[in-house]
Amino acid sequence: MAAEDKFESVLSTRYCKNSPLVSILSETNKATLWRQLWIWLGEAEKELGLKQVTQEAIDEMKSQRDNFDWSFIRAEERKLKHDVMAHNHAFGKICPTAAGIIHLGATSCYVQDNADLIAYRDSIDHILKRFATVIDRLAQFSLNNKEVVTVGRTHYQTASLVTVGKRGVLWAQELLMAFQSLAEFRDKMRFRGIKGATGTQDSFLTLFSGDEEKVEALDELVTKKANFANRFLITGQTYSRQQDSQLVFSLSLLGAAAKKVCTDIRVLQAFGELLEPFEKDQIGSSAMPYKKNPMKSERCCALARKLINAPQEALTILADQGLERTLDDSAGRRMLIPDVLLTAEALLTTLQNIFEGLTVQTDNVKKIVEDEIAFLGLEKAMMMLTEEGVDRQQAHAVIRKTALEAKQLQATQKVDIRQTMADPFFDSVRDRIVGLVNNPINFTGRCVSQTENFIAKELKPTISKYLDQSAAKVQLDV
């Protein structure tokens, strides 16, 4: 059946079809990891003295690890209604010498949970690299525009001047905090290890004739073979699903941060201040050919909503895990976590494309600043007046009255700074303010140095070890 004739997830076929995550989260990789976990278990058991595990059996498993008879596996699972045992039988069929020691002492969650954790870890490693590149691209945009003066906005209304670069590092800070959350999760991530059917390790204690030190060594050795620094000391049949919730929550922070950034970009594109990349042959609307819609930022917002809402499901999976184990988690985890990882990848890929082509509509930005500078100079006037002994509250009241009157006048004509400061109250500071207005950067405070300092002192050091300096620009297929 052709791909177009059946439903497949849009994450893997539309937004992430060229991503390594599609392979990392695939059935083939999962099954390969299960077999690798059986190999590691056999190796560790042999190293610790189990006579029934031979080098011949281990070598046989290694030689057949990637040999899959999927028709046999599917038939076995239909019959047994148990995926791990279906794979166990399939592996044993092609490894007759090892068949008797495959899965020795283990329970299904030994391969299921541990393989999931390896796949999650490898996915996170890729996502962190992508995330670092996204933040780096935004940092470059911010530095390039650190002196481009623009109107700040609070409550979506005109506020004190900022620079485009300073606004950019505000966005970068939100993304960086989400990045740090995910990186911290990755560093603390724990492996399930070998725990047995209910987490007691009784089967392994039996195999090692009651030698607890060897059971502990087995757990530690398999963890090291899987290249994990940390492991759970206590589990039921499964590892705590709270760890899954922490992963999902870390990615939900990415969603929330990205939605804030992309909503801002959409608003600023509507104001005519920014323009997300719009390709030569791109069509904005089938009905309105003149439109340049911020469709990439809109897509990011849609993907972000999926991440923002995901923790609720992860928390219910955690809450419904009964006693040492129930299957309440199984179907949900199979869908939720791969979807969350792929959604994060799709979001970051699109964000990278936006930041690599985001442009400032400088002429319009300058015009908006010129229209508002007559009002925005008044805040600095208030500070100067207080330096001369004027009561701050009195200055605020006069400026408020003057500004509101000028705003009404602005509806029918252009207002300049001399008009807003015509009151004799401003005589002592008027000339100084008028002189400053000729160069609006004078009203942006420490925007330039804040931008430079944040990038140099916090952003770059945080992402440096994850950043691939050779990362290519993103070209979106859709």
Curated annotation (Swiss-Prot):
Keywords: Lyase, Purine biosynthesis. GO terms for biological process: 'de novo' AMP biosynthetic process; 'de novo' IMP biosynthetic process. It catalyses: N(6)-(1,2-dicarboxyethyl)-AMP = fumarate + AMP; (2S)-2-[5-amino-1-(5-phospho-beta-D-ribosyl)imidazole-4-carboxamido]succinate = 5-amino-1-(5-phospho-beta-D-ribosyl)imidazole-4-carboxamide + fumarate. It is an enzyme of class 4 (lyase). It comes from the Eukaryota. The keyword Mitochondrion does not apply. One of its GO terms (cellular component) is cytosol. The active site is at H155, S285. Its EC number is 4.3.2.2. Pathway: Purine metabolism; AMP biosynthesis via de novo pathway; AMP from IMP: step 2/2; Purine metabolism; IMP biosynthesis via de novo pathway; 5-amino-1-(5-phospho-D-ribosyl)imidazole-4-carboxamide from 5-amino-1-(5-phospho-D-ribosyl)imidazole-4-carboxylate: step 2/2. Substrate binds at R14, Y15, K81, H82, D83, T107, S108, Q237, R299, R325, S330, R334. Signal peptide: none annotated. InterPro entries: AdenyloSucc_lyase_C, Fumarate_lyase_CS, Fumarate_lyase_fam, Fumarate_lyase_N, L-Aspartase-like. GO terms for molecular function: (S)-2-(5-amino-1-(5-phospho-D-ribosyl)imidazole-4-carboxamido) succinate lyase (fumarate-forming) activity; N6-(1,2-dicarboxyethyl)AMP AMP-lyase (fumarate-forming) activity. Catalyzes two non-sequential steps in de novo AMP synthesis: converts (S)-2-(5-amino-1-(5-phospho-D-ribosyl)imidazole-4-carboxamido)succinate (SAICAR) to fumarate plus 5-amino-1-(5-phospho-D-ribosyl)imidazole-4-carboxamide, and thereby also contributes to de novo IMP synthesis, and converts succinyladenosine monophosphate (SAMP) to AMP and fumarate. Homotetramer. Residues from neighboring subunits contribute catalytic and substrate-binding residues to each active site. Belongs to the lyase 1 family. Adenylosuccinate lyase subfamily. PANTHER family: ADENYLOSUCCINATE LYASE (PTHR43172:SF1). This is Adenylosuccinate lyase. The gene is adsl-1.
